[in-house]
Amino acid sequence: MKSKKELMDALNKLVITEICSIFPDIQRVWEDQEFQKKFASTIGVKPKDVTNVPKRNKSSYLFFCQEIRPSIVAEMPDIKPNQVMVHLGKKWSELPLEDRKKYDVMAVEDRKRYLASKEANKKLNKPVKISGYLQFCADERKIKLKFPDLTTKDITAKLGGMWNDYKKNNPQYLKSKYGYEIVEQHYDYEKNEIDKENIIPSSHRRKMVPSIPVSICSSNVKAIQELIGTTKSSKKNKEIKV
């Protein structure tokens, strides 16, 4: 008896085969970046803007693969992609350290290029939205001078109590600068980027770029048909069963 995974793989293969038989050009259209943007908008997914994002730098190994891969494919045209990677890894491990130096130099130069591009694309002094409480804490930093022996935790607790007292003693505080839900200030863009990297692990971030196809499912087939603009006039009796 087949496992659930095997049955789902077989079902997905059948669905994709049926779709491709009805729309011969669907793969070409599906991989088109403009189509991915339109489709993402149709199903409510906002594509990530990668217009001004500098291209990441390559490692020494990637430069090596870029140079050696064509010769491996030329020697073995029927080789599978995963086997190509095996051959590349083997050749890289056997490559003398002296011969690796040129790829190390290429990697260093490419990293300089990336860092320079990244620096040029930074938007310094971009406004950030913070709460009224944080603005209040920023204004009350002098508490550290009054109580130099307090720990950071104690200072935070004291500021919280002061904030609660401020709201009680100032019923109209909503009309003050602390009353706004968010206060616009300027911040150091580079520091903010570092903070985001430390707070949100890259593996937990939701990414959506046009080059990565969205998963095909039965509920999205209609949207695909409308965006492609093709008809099933020649195959009216053919249906996709999921």
From Swiss-Prot:
GO terms for molecular function: DNA binding. The keyword Repeat applies. Disulfide bonds: none annotated. It is found in: Host nucleus. InterPro entries: HMG_box_dom (IPR009071), HMG_box_dom_sf (IPR036910), HMGB (IPR050342). Residues 54-122, 126-197 bind DNA. One of its GO terms (cellular component) is host cell nucleus. It holds the Pfam family HMG_box. Keywords: DNA-binding, Host nucleus, Repeat. This is High mobility group protein homolog.
